[in-house]
Amino acid sequence: MISREEAINFLNSTSSKDILDKLAQINNTFKREYITYSKNVFIPLSKWCRNKCGYCIFREDKPSLMKPNEVKEILLKGDRLGCREALFTFGEHVDENKEIKEQLKSMGYDNILEYLYDLEEWTLNNTSLLPHTNCGILNYDELKMLKDVNASMGLMLENASERLMNTIAHKHSPGKHPKLRIEMIENAGKLKIPFTTGLLIGIGETNEEIVDSLFKIKEIHEKYGHIQEVIIQNFRAKKGIPMENFKEPSPIKMLKVIILAKLILDDISIQIPPNLNRETGQLFLLAGVDDWGGVSPLTRDYVNPEAEWPEIKELREWTEELGLKLKMRLPVYDKYISEEWLSEKVYNKIIEMGWLKE
């Protein structure tokens, strides 16, 4: 619906008319009744990570690992609160840490993915939550193994530019090389794993790099059809990170990127984190956002701990003020709930939950 050159010109433009024209185009083209969200629990199995991103506060040097009883307690509490997504995450390649490796061995596991698989299988067997894993770079065989117990999986592309590997954002983060991330997203497509990816805006990228990243996601999705949602996430400066003095992207910049994401990505859902956009989130709905992402009544956002989740009643108020309806979803979007896209275990669990009848 828009060319690369047109998209770059739009981001570079200071014309308010350009913005209003494209907002009108989006609202005339994409007819929406519902804005969705996922009610989840956030389970950070470990915060140690081989990457040291300039904007990250999630990473810890301490090689800690959540114990099974800690995880199961959160899952059971979340189940009682009506959560339906279990977001499992940990730092990339935690197995490189000797102390974590020893902790895993003491529990009878050779690696973190064996431990993760058991926890996710337990989740399916003992709760009404569905696992979604986002743990950094995984290879084809690892993705294939985890597909068996995951409703969907995710990895932020962040940006497709290799140039950022030489900047404060990613110079100490080998796992953030776009070739690795693109390869993983493509492998997920080959395996028919419903997938979440996204861009991180404000980490030193150029407008051209933003546009090229959106077109790269489009290219991959056109080949495999597995990208269910794209997150447009704004960088937030935090005390103590290397990029604490970096300027955050303006609301207008975010608005324009969201507009382009909708025009370029078409039928892929566009998500923004509501806890990072409390004052501007409603405006972004006008630009094509149709999903608020995961929010939790139990656990905090460990990636952005300073930003509390809004309550669901707040999301409903923000949504209904624009004449739209708020609707809860699973971590896998309804259009991917089929035997074509899900493992037998996960598909049968969703049928057992009666979700498709709701």
Swiss-Prot record:
Q: What does this protein do?
A: Catalyzes the radical-mediated synthesis of 7,8-didemethyl-8-hydroxy-5-deazariboflavin (FO) from 5-amino-5-(4-hydroxybenzyl)-6-(D-ribitylimino)-5,6-dihydrouracil.
Q: Can you state the subunit structure given in the record?
A: Consists of two subunits, CofG and CofH.
InterPro entries, per the entry: Aldolase_TIM, CofG_family, Elp3/MiaA/NifB-like_rSAM, F420, rSAM
GO MF annotation terms: 4 iron, 4 sulfur cluster binding; 7,8-didemethyl-8-hydroxy-5-deazariboflavin synthase activity; iron ion binding; transferase activity, transferring alkyl or aryl (other than methyl) groups
Family assignment from sequence similarity: Belongs to the radical SAM superfamily. CofG family.
Q: Where does [4Fe-4S] cluster bind?
A: C49, C53, C56
Record's keyword annotation contains Iron-sulfur: yes
Organism, by scientific name, is Methanocaldococcus jannaschii (strain ATCC 43067 / DSM 2661 / JAL-1 / JCM 10045 / NBRC 100440)
Obligatory cofactor(s): [4Fe-4S] cluster
Residue intervals of the Radical SAM core domain: 35-275
Q: In which pathway does it act?
A: Cofactor biosynthesis; coenzyme F0 biosynthesis
Q: Which reaction does it catalyse?
A: 5-amino-5-(4-hydroxybenzyl)-6-(D-ribitylimino)-5,6-dihydrouracil + S-adenosyl-L-methionine = 7,8-didemethyl-8-hydroxy-5-deazariboflavin + 5'-deoxyadenosine + L-methionine + NH4(+) + H(+)
Q: Give the cofactor note.
A: Binds 1 [4Fe-4S] cluster. The cluster is coordinated with 3 cysteines and an exchangeable S-adenosyl-L-methionine.
Could you tell me the EC number(s) of this protein? 4.3.1.32
This chain belongs to the protein called 7,8-didemethyl-8-hydroxy-5-deazariboflavin synthase
